[in-house]
Design a protein with these regions (language model features):
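Alpha-helical transmembrane segments in inner-membrane proteins
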Residues: 2-375
Length: 375
């Protein structure tokens, strides 16, 4: 029987653990911000934050037409590494948003499909993204690097098309009942078919187009380091993230009921089919945009929800917040490490590959500690 002292001790350990993670988050953020792009050396934190403060003041002056904007060129010239610091800061925000979005998507999928191995790419989303990039590169070749709008249109459109196809095929296979198992099987089959198509087309692509496709698949939009492009990309991702995350947060109490069979969820007053459809649409938009920015990061969506349950418990609102925080932290760590690893002929180490190498052993340790299965 748990005593009051045991309860208070557990609460204290929990709070200390969360405080430790918060401190780790700040340290990793400062370290990643101070890494000089391409130089594998650090600038001083004082210089980095001074540049960010100057950038914020200049943006406010530009927006409200203040006299400070007339000194913009002179102030920037006297601030070492100004544009590099601002671009690095924007990339870090993009990285955190992508990590949070992909981890939250994995947590939602595992509840919606009542499957501890479910991931947001299982219903054809990843296949749609690859097909969209393939069509874009086949049409525009090297120009695809700078086409943010078309890239979103192609990949989001095909990702949603694959999702609709999977849901329709699952409904047909389940005899007008949307079977979760049938949807997962259909998604797996479509993924194999589209993967074969992508492989065949890649074999017949010119070397230049193949390099563009592989770069966009592994590095995403971060391959474009243009100052203005990075700013527009950040605003677009932030709008998509908030537009999808706010409804999911509002529906967080429904997910606890969705962890039960559909018949039981209906007795609780929910419409499981409607909840699942709305969530799949929101998660598809959020995860697709994140993959377009940071490349394929499949392991993160599988590992982070399990780590979150281990640290914060199995209540979905705790899992949701924990997944959001831990996903941002882990992907930011991967971003910092990848900036220090330069591969001749390839550039910096792909963040998606590094995320898989980091998350896999962490997930194995967490699952070994739990030993009692998935709640």
């Amino acid at each position: 029987m748990q005593t009051g002292r045991d309860f208070l001790s557990g609460r204290l350990r929990s709070r200390l653990g969360r405080a430790g993670l918060a401190v780790l988050f700040l340290l990793v953020f400062c370290f990643a911000l101070c890494i000089r792009t391409g130089a594998r050396e650090l600038m001083s934190p004082a210089q980095a934050f001074s540049n960010l403060w100057l950038w914020a003041r200049l943006e406010i002056a530009e927006r409200f037409d203040l006299p400070l904007k007339l000194q913009r060129a002179a102030l920037i010239q006297t601030s070492p590494y100004f544009f590099e610091t601002v671009s690095r800061f924007r990339n870090l925000i993009v990285t955190m948003l992508c990590g949070a979005a992909i981890a939250v998507g994995g947590a939602c999928y595992q509840v919606l499909f009542r499957n501890p191995m479910a991931a947001p790419t299982m219903l054809g989303v990843g296949s749609g993204i690859n097909l969209g990039l393939l069509i874009l590169v086949a049409q525009y070749s090297v120009e695809a690097y700078a086409m943010m709008g078309r890239r979103f249109a192609y990949c989001l459109g095909l990702a949603f098309a694959m999702l609709v196809l999977v849901m329709a095929a699952g409904r047909f296979a389940g005899k007008n009942r949307r079977s979760v198992t049938d949807m997962l099987l259909v998604g797996s089959v479509l993924g194999q078919v589209s993967g074969a198509v992508v492989t065949f087309v890649r074999m017949n692509m010119e070397q230049e187009d193949l390099t563009v496709f592989q770069t966009l698949s592994m590095y995403g939009l971060t391959v474009n380091t243009d100052y203005e492009f990075a700013g527009k990309a950040l605003m677009l991702l932030l709008a998509l993230f908030l537009g999808c995350m706010i409804p999911l947060m509002a529906m967080r109490f429904s997910f606890d009921a969705m962890s039960y069979p559909d018949e039981d969820a209906r007795l609780m007053g929910l419409n499981p089919g409607l909840v699942r459809t709305v969530c799949l649409i929101l998660i598809t938009a959020m995860v697709t945009s994140s993959i377009l920015f940071c490349g394929t990061i499949g392991t993160l969506s599988l590992a982070v929800p399990h780590i979150s349950r281990y640290l914060y418990g199995s209540r979905f609102r705790s899992v949701l917040g924990g997944s959001c925080f831990l996903g941002a932290l882990l992907l930011m760590i991967c971003r910092a490490i990848s900036s220090l690893i330069y591969l001749p002929g390839m550039g910096f180490f792909p963040i998606g590959t590094l995320a898989g190498l980091v998350c896999a052993p962490v997930l194995a340790m967490v699952l070994a500690q739990r030993r009692r299965g998935w709640d």
